[in-house]
Curated annotation (Swiss-Prot):
Its cofactor is heme b; Ca(2+). Substrate binds at residue 170. Binds 1 heme b (iron(II)-protoporphyrin IX) group per subunit. Heme b binds at residue 201. This is Peroxidase 33. Keywords: Calcium, Disulfide bond, Glycoprotein, Heme, Hydrogen peroxide, Iron, Metal-binding, Oxidoreductase, Peroxidase, Pyrrolidone carboxylic acid, Secreted, Signal, Vacuole. Belongs to the peroxidase family. Classical plant (class III) peroxidase subfamily. Expressed in roots. Glycans are attached at residues 88, 217, 229, 245, 286. Induction: Transiently induced by ozone treatment. Up-regulated during a continuous drought stress. Early induced by benzothiadiazol, a chemical analog of salicylic acid. Enhanced expression following both compatible or incompatible pathogen attacks. The gene is PER33. The record marks 69 as: Transition state stabilizer. Removal of H(2)O(2), oxidation of toxic reductants, biosynthesis and degradation of lignin, suberization, auxin catabolism, response to environmental stresses such as wounding, pathogen attack and oxidative stress. These functions might be dependent on each isozyme/isoform in each plant tissue. May be implicated in the systemic acquired resistance response via the salicylic acid signal transduction pathway.
Length: 354
């Protein structure tokens, strides 16, 4: 029996789509994340990510902290699915416009360059979500922090979630009860999750606009925040005058602003936390379960590092999009065009790798 080329093509598509549907029905979406996920399919991905960050650090010393913040803000909104990287479309609003991201989230161009380099080495293989997770880990390590293997195997969302971002991202003026509720809402219910992840503010910068109330009119009293060290208050007022440019940047950590270490916690003990939500961990009347952790992390760098890695892995496992869910975006800013074609091929690749 002979078949025409068109018949073969039609048959091939039928098989592909059938396999895809069967896989979707079988739903491997509960696939477990593993550090070895790309060991065969893209063994150089970590080196590519690292090299991209190293190159960027030469001209932008802030980029490590900015990338870590992107990962944090990604994971808190529908899990770590790279939804924060999507631009506006006619179907959804970007998370970049959320209150916690607008005019503050940064690093998107370096993520673009990173993804282009990864695609050249391993086409259609590494998700933007996993790449951002690796980039966050490498940013910490390059700044002097711990090194660890991140669990991988996430896939990318098909949309952004602006309303959820506005609801889920913690604000710099949050009280400790608000912070605890915020973290618990996404499944991070241990005090160590909150205190260790807040330690990401051991490097990076913040804009004056987020601390003006602390400096001049805390809780509409016309007075500064009473938990703010008076000497530090005067330093901050010099950097952020009452009628000054509120976009001016201030170091989160006045001691070692570019180094990932435990000095953030030393600062909190001295009432030198930059934003209210940081100082709340040590100065709030509700801090009975967080003060001991602040003290422990201030006294032991390795204690902090161990807690931070554990909390990062827990955050990275918030409702991950895996298996046949979502897709592997070719450009982190947009959902793949011809998504059905890409998704079917991805499903076949997924089956082949099992």
């Amino acid at each position: 029996m002979q078949f025409s080329s068109s018949s073969i093509t039609s048959f091939t598509w039928t098989v592909l789509i059938t396999v895809g549907c069967l896989m979707l029905c079988a739903s491997f979406s509960d696939a477990q994340l593993t550090p070895t996920f790309y060991d065969t399919s893209c063994p150089t991905v970590t080196n590519i990510v690292r090299d991209t960050i190293v190159n960027e650090l030469r001209s932008d010393p802030r980029i490590a902290g900015s990338i870590l913040r992107l990962h944090f803000h990604d994971c808190f909104v529908n899990g770590c699915d790279a939804s924060i990287l999507l631009d506006n479309t006619t179907s959804f609003r970007t998370e970049k416009d959320a209150l916690g991201n607008a005019n503050s989230a940064r690093g998107f161009p370096v993520i673009d360059r990173m993804k282009a380099a990864v695609e050249r080495a391993c086409p259609r293989t590494v998700s933007c979500a996993d790449m951002l997770t690796i980039a966050a880990q490498q940013s910490v390590t390059l700044a002097g922090g711990p090194s660890w293997k991140v669990p991988l195997g996430r896939r990318d969302s098909l949309q952004a979630f602006l309303d959820l971002a506005n609801a889920n991202l913690p604000a710099p003026f949050f009280t400790l009860p608000q912070l605890k509720a915020n973290f618990k809402n996404v499944g991070l219910d241990r005090p160590s999750d909150l205190v260790a992840l807040s330690g990401a503010h051991t490097f990076g910068k913040n804009q004056c606009r987020f601390i003006m109330d602390r400096l001049y009119n805390f809780s509409n009293t016309g007075l500064p925040d009473p938990t703010l060290n008076t000497t530090y208050l005067q330093t901050l007022r010099g950097q952020c005058p009452r009628n000054g440019n509120q976009s001016v940047l201030v170091d989160f950590d006045l001691r070692t602003p570019l180094v990932f270490d435990n000095k953030y916690y030393v600062n909190l003990k001295e009432q030198k936390g930059l934003i209210q939500s940081d100082q709340e961990l040590f100065s709030s009347p509700n801090a009975t379960d967080t003060i001991p952790l602040v003290r422990a992390y201030a006294d032991g760098t390795q204690t902090f590092f161990n807690a931070f890695v554990e909390a990062m892995n827990r955050m990275g496992n918030i409702t991950p999009t895996t298996g046949t869910q979502g897709q592997i975006r070719l450009n982190c800013r947009v959902v793949n065009s011809n998504s059905l074609l890409h998704d079917v091929v991805d499903i076949v690749d997924f089956v082949s790798s099992m």
